Amino acid sequence: MRIISKRRAMTIYRQHPESRIFRYCTGKYQWHGSVCHYTGRDVPDITGVLAVYAERRRTAADRMLD
């Protein structure tokens, strides 16, 4: 399975009304770059998962740098 854009993931989500959105975060990786650096990367298959997308969430540390 590959990471796709959030837009494509939301299209898939709307096509499957029984589906739900879950946060997938292992806490294992530090974020580097932008979302486009993650799109297209392979991720392990997860039973029942239709799509995976990357989304950067701002942390308190990120806000302090502004």
UniProtKB/Swiss-Prot annotation:
Belongs to the YeeT/YkfH/YpjJ family. It comes from Escherichia coli (strain K12). It comes from the Bacteria. InterPro entries: DUF987. This is Uncharacterized protein YpjJ. The gene is ypjJ.
